[in-house]
A protein has these predicted regions:
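Flexible, acidic/Gly-rich N-terminal and inter-domain linker regions that tether
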Residues: 1-88
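Short helix/loop capping segments that flank catalytic or ligand/cofactor-binding pockets
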Residues: 46-50, 56-58, 71-74, 101-104, ...
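Radical SAM enzyme [4Fe-4S]-AdoMet core and its adjacent flexible, acidic
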Residues: 53-55, 63, 154-183, 247-249, ...
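Conserved, mostly hydrophobic/aromatic
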Residues: 63, 98, 123, 236, ...
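N-terminal pre-triad scaffold of radical SAM enzymes
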Residues: 77-106, 124, 139, 314
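Iron-sulfur (Fe-S) cluster-binding segments and ferredoxin-like electron-carrier domains
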Residues: 105-122
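Conserved SAM/AdoMet-binding glycine-rich loop
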Residues: 129-278, 282-286
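Catalytic cores of alpha/beta
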Residues: 220, 285-302
Length: 347
């Protein structure tokens, strides 16, 4: 086991808080992760066991094929139902886990970095059930997960020895050991959209564009994406354009997004369609300064993007970015990190 700084220490010291986060971050893994112990005064300790092994394909199939009702509880009828159900009632979960490694995202803690997926047959069976559900009009809103185009563990090393502690899979660039392949996901999408009663299959859970562009055969996926799975706009998440901020976010250089955008437009011309990209951006992320905000504004002006909304960073439990927001330091190096906290700084 490994001792964390005590509750009293992390409560009194931001440096101890950052140290505790770094230890937890490196041990959030089922093969190599150690049992973590945090002392709470002189009476007791809190013990956190390593995560369990991610569910297998067979286990995921069994769980997702249980006879769920697929709607809200009748107790909500008196209040008019739950409007948000419309966003997910005709969506299909195909995978769990994410090796994307974004600093502002807690999915690594919820589901782990090792991706596990349902079988194609299980997904098709669920899609068939959706076509028989009341209210189905021929549109499946999503076939995806934390990241839609992740269908397998990043590499063989990950399966044998666990995820790497010294580097991320995609940041600062895709690891050379990574198995990059969209053929399985393409097969799933083809099978679902070929079902009787299915008019269109959308992808709403997000395409990781740097992973797609690293695939030597990305043209095939891009063409089918534009031809069959985009309603008119595709939402992707470059998050910023300034290299310093992207580094803090653990996101790829903006040149990767630009290459993706050009490929997307090229595919549109080939198919004689007019589809748009809606890029997501985050303002005042830890490490983002006024000059970085100006750089982003100029980028938007030069590219012609007119965002109708911008997400201002807000701290959420369990993320690297939130640790930096609170401690104002990098938990792995101890280096100071600028954080815009006041309304004046954010504006």
């Amino acid at each position: 086991y490994q001792m964390l700084p005590s509750w009293e220490e992390v409560s009194a010291s931001k440096r101890a808080f950052a140290e505790s986060f770094a230890i937890q971050y490196r041990n959030n893994e089922w093969i190599q992760g150690q049992r973590l112990v945090e002392r709470y005064d002189d009476r007791l300790c809190i013990v956190q066991n390593p995560p369990q092994e991610p569910l297998s394909t067979e286990e995921l199939d069994e769980i997702y094929e249980l006879p769920y009702e697929g709607t809200y509880h009748p107790m909500y009828e008196a209040a008019g139902g739950v409007p948000a159900i419309r966003e997910v009632e005709f969506s299909i979960v195909s995978n769990r886990g994410c090796f994307g490694g974004c600093a502002f995202c807690a999915l690594t803690y919820h589901q782990g970095r090792e991706v596990r997926s349902r079988s194609r047959e299980s997904i098709v069976r669920e899609a068939e059930r959706l076509t028989r559900r009341p209210g189905f009009k021929g549109y499946i809103h999503d076939v995806g997960g934390p990241t839609a185009n992740f269908r397998a563990p990043a590499c063989e090393e990950q399966l044998a020895r666990g995820v790497c502690k010294h580097r991320d899979c995609l940041y600062p660039r895709p690891c050379k050991r990574m198995k990059i392949d969209h053929s399985d996901y393409l097969g799933v999408l083809r099978a679902v959209r070929g079902l009787p009663g299915v008019k269109k299959v959308f992808i709403r859970s997000g395409i990781r564009f740097d992973y797609l562009m690293a695939d030597a055969a990305h043209g095939e996926f891009m063409e089918e994406l534009c031809r069959y799975h985009v309603s008119g706009t595709l939402k992707v998440a470059p998050e910023h354009c300034a290299a310093r901020v992207l580094s803090r976010m653990r996101k790829p250089d903006i040149s990767v997004f630009e290459a993706f955008r050009k490929e997307y437009q090229k595919t549109n011309r080939k198919l004689s369609v007019k589809q748009y990209i809606i890029p997501y951006f985050i303002s005042s992320h830890p490490g983002s300064t006024l000059s970085d905000a100006v750089e982003l504004a100029l980028f938007l002006k030069q590219t012609g993007f007119v965002p109708d909304q911008v997400q201002d960073f807000y701290p959420t439990p369990g993320t690297l970015a939130t640790c930096e927001y609170y401690t104002e330091r990098d938990p792995f190096t101890g280096a100071p990190v600028y954080v815009a906290k006041t309304m004046e700084e954010k504006k």
